[in-house]
Amino acid sequence: MVRMTIAMLLLALPVAAGQGDASADALQEAARRGDLARVEALLDQGVQVDAATRYGTTPLFFAAARGHAAIVRALVEGGADVNAADTFYGTTVLRRALGNRNVEIARYLLEQGATDADRALLVAARRGDRALLEAAIATGHVHADALAEALVVAGDRNDSAMTDRLGDVTPAPPPVPQIDINRLFLYAGSYTNDFLRRVVELRVVDRTLVARVSDTSMLSFTPLTDTSFVAESDGTTVSFDIRGSMVNRIELTRNGESAFYRPTAETESREVAPVGEADPISRVALPAAPRTAPSPWPGFRGPSASGVADGQGAATTWDAETGENIAWKTSIPGLANSAPVIWGDQVFVTTAVSGGGDDTFRVGQYGDTASVDDLSPHSWHLYSLDRLSGAIRWERVVHEGRPQTKRHQKASQANSTPATDGEHVVAVFGAIGLVVCYDLDGTLLWEVDVGVLDSGWFFDPDVQWGHSSSPIIHEGLVILQADTQEESYIAALDLESGREVWRAIRADEISTFATPTVYTGSDGNELITNGTTIRAYDPATGEQLWALGPNSELAIATPIFSDDVIYLTAGYPPVRPVYAVRPGHRGDLSLIDGATASDAVAWSTNRGGTYVPTPIVYRGHLYTNANNGRLTCYDARTGEIVYRRRIGGVGGSYSASPVAADGKLYFTSEEGDTHVVRAGPEYELLATNTVGEIVMANPAVSDGMLVIRTQGHVYGIAE
């Protein structure tokens, strides 16, 4: 009762100077969560009805997206802008309502003056929604192109009533325009939607615009206007937004859904194998590589996060179905994206087991931001497996309880890879805010509650995806990058006790999912972090050394280094950069407008960076692997593109980062296929191997054993 009274008193206070941001946050939270009474109270206090986030989203945007009709009405009656659009994706309030199938709200927005009537008209035609169609027509803002396109869509659905209605209001179509061949070639190229992680490839064949969308068959388009086309085979439409003499973006509508795609940095070269055509496997074998002394794989991506395992005898071919080169296979319960680590004859893995049994998991290239709503009791486990046999040496139940955050459909409650130095094994579980340390015999040495690490979609703080940054061990410290929805930081814990040694606040950093790396080289040690701003710290003290931007709004890939150059990449808007940074500099290293290099930056590009997989530097080349399997090979010294190919020629979806060993590169898809490619300036596929299960984790390699962790098993692979 006391708590309720205090809350009501606080709510009744007028908005004071300096409290505007907090009040705006409160209004947005109330709109997101459907709290009509609080929305009305805050508006009565004078809180700005269109108070926006850093991304331009207003309370009306969230209410329309969530389907809170009463709040939408209250906000509109309070003066909210029904045509507001966010500044990041450029999405209008109406489009968010339509995208989430909140049709009643969409009709209301149209009645209140929303001008994006063309979109509503097309959605109505695709869904057969006559009421929405009439609301769009009634605005008087629908254009002839949209009416003609809607008429085609309704006809494809054999909806005679809607076709008749559209026929009544659609002007007579002009003759099919003859598009100048030079304009068609302007449209040709590759376009990408980073959110959906899909690619559209447009080509000109016999004066006709043709397209392939990800892994679909080829579509041929007929022009509707100079800038819009329809594929008569299935009704797919594509429209071009032209700025000056360049294509700014395209809008593709197919199967009832629309999405925007932007041009890639350049049209894929003719060396890129078309999706769906498998690459031939080379018959030229690599010479046998000499085995060197066993080297551990102590953390995320192995030694110094390099992903390189030369001299460790990694197998080239295997097949789980036939048993070829499968040394062992061990079942692990639960769900985990964490990768295996290896020290000596032990393999360490973590997992989280849901008591509710919700194993919802969705692979592939899609843009769904939804979380898995499973906050049932879980148990978190750490396993030690025998490297030679796969037998479970020991298992420890780290914690039992309920996760305090949800997870993404492509994530787990055990995303972070453990780390070991041969005496300690450290694991992090963000959803319960727990860092634990065991010795190699499974004895608990310490555990520390660091607070729940709530990482999610920067655009909507209620969308939780799950913390995934892995701990690293460096000179007696456990370093943890904790970029969350609020209060981001990076900290170092004492490896022997878990005591916090230092903490650096990253006040302006949003959720990131990258693991940090300690550069060790001639210029001293630098702790490198990926994020919306790239930063380097002194790993001993936490003092910030330098910063670099701009960067993507979602950073996932781990920084890597080779030959005294640090490489960073990210693959999400507003820029998708690749940076090659020289260590040893201080301050703001950001390039001046138009520059691609400086004393601190060896080379860079603001397009072409990859999203989830961390790149790899190997034998003078930098390899970046996009989620869709597009492989780009750069000259690591100059940044010149050496080649681009589609891995295996068959597309697929990739989250695991590549590893390299003995002149070979290993790329493992979410579908469980590992494509082995010869390292060097020419693309050559050596083998395609499968385990037939979902793979999200990076492989680990040590002393003749290649270890692959699937959703269900850990495989030991050896020749």
Regions found by a protein language model. Give the residues of each.
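N-terminal segments that cap or nucleate solenoid repeat domains
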Residues: 20-55, 59, 132-136
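Start-of-repeat signature of ankyrin repeats
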Residues: 23, 56, 89-90, 117, ...
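Ankyrin repeat A-helix N-terminal signature
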Residues: 29-34, 62-68, 96-102, 123-129, ...
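Ankyrin repeat structural motif
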Residues: 35-43, 68-76, 102-110, 129-137, ...
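Ankyrin-repeat inter-repeat connecting loop/turn
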Residues: 49, 82, 116-117, 143-144
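Ankyrin repeat boundary/linker residues
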Residues: 53, 86-87
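Peripheral terminal and inter-domain segments
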Residues: 167, 171-275
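Noncatalytic, solvent-exposed loop/strand surfaces
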Residues: 269-719
